[in-house]
Amino acid sequence: MSGTLATPRALLSLLVAASLVVAGAAQADDAGIRPQDIKRQALSSTVVEMAYSTSQQALFVSAPDWKEEARSRVLRLDPNTLAIKAEIPLQVKGFGVALNDAGNRLYLTQAFNGEVGVVDTTTNHALGSIKLLDKAVLEQAYKQAGISGKRLDFLLAELKKFKITEDYLYRLREIKYDAQSGRLFLPGLGFGVDSVLYVVDTKAGKLEKVIPGFGYNAVGITLDEKGRRVFVSNMQGQVITLNADTLAITATHEVQADQLLNLVYDPAGNRLLGVDQGIDRDDYRNHHLGHDYVKRSSGHRVFALDADSGKVLASELTDEVPIGLLLDERSQRLYVANRKGVRVDHGAGTLTVFDAKTLKRLQTVDLPPHPNSLALDPKGDALFVTVKNDGASTKAGKPESVVRIQLHSN
């Protein structure tokens, strides 16, 4: 998503995101990733996010279909072999995932119809969806939001260029489940307007609240379940903190990272770990804010922030266009999926491995074309990565893949 407005598929493709060769393991220790540790399985025309179920001993993968929406599915994989054990049909495309393993429910963001899909992980059946918002006439919605002048002119010109009249005012990308409250938290990325946070009561199966105040392109989200905090990052260099119980915004911090696309919370160090994406979206952001945004970071970096203040504790370069990240608390390793390009014919994406305490880079593993999202076996034995196509692979009709990486104790 290069800006606030684009075609719906382009909007999501910038956010969400083959032979495998291990590159330059010289910096890695004996516990590094070796070629024989990597297994790849081609699965579907599109794969996006994953959730590992301990109770089911299964890996669930969202597999939306762009050509024929009714062919969208959730794939249930054997986590050891990556064999498909079940295909769960969906009526619409599902992208981001959150798992309530104790309740045997998988939740999916349905980015283009304003709903959250629900899947029973024991029966492998879709249970319908929870409605969050309806389509709006966008010009009317912008005027009702008080948008005028140059900003309104810019937005209307974009609508005309892409021939859009009605659409959903917010895009649903990431989703987090809070086991203590039974709530789902979903940033609603504003389609020309400031972003919001959707709160879903899963026990009642309905929308509980829509919370405003999340700025330009709210994208990243993570939970501090014990501390009862929700953290949301946006594309204007802010991290917003919400009380997970009262649903009150308790802090908005200006941070030294411009585009924190995804976040994870480190409870041991009370830190927020995030990837600063580094994609040029200046024109859209400046029109949205009404002034020229002054960049604070070079982008393509990993950040460690103090969760209380937003202060930078550490920052290191990763490879270009980082997307997903995952913290292995046991081994204190931070894994980052880097696309290394957007809409390129030949992708050369990588997985970078960092010491989570210091952010020292330990290893770089080639995972072309475009590694996207990550999941971990709770025992810490295996790391899973979705790998998306580049332009050439898409044109050739090749399926996208999931990679399993055997991990070793340090």
Tell me what each language-model feature is:
Residues L5, V16, L20-N410:
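Predominantly soluble domains enriched in secretory-pathway, periplasmic, or organellar proteins
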Residues M1-L14:
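Bacterial N-terminal signal peptides that target proteins for export
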